[in-house]
């Protein structure tokens, strides 16, 4: 369901597994330090939504097809893994609505 970017702790996978089954961490599927385009390609191929704290993923630069996948951008600076997991769980329905969409972007929290 979700592909957690390496700027978020791998520990979150177990915390949110019940709500978001099939969630994986980047380091476990494409390796630490993988370029964003590799992460995006993996997400597209496996129907995953990228969860990241990297603002670059929000920008869909015309002609740059390398980051074409659905993204949840976490706008919580200097936060704990528990803070991110709570944010994701509290926004479960919004996140699950991204499935089946094309190039959807969701920034959380939305306020």
Functional labels for PLM-detected ranges:
Residues 1-10, 14-20, 31, 37-40, ...:
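Acidic, PIN/NYN-like endoribonuclease modules and their adjacent C-terminal/linker elements
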Residues 25-30:
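Short, flexible loop segments at the rims of nucleotide/cofactor-binding pockets, characterized by
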Residues 44-62:
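Acidic, metal-binding active-site segment of PIN/NYN-like and related structure-specific nucleases
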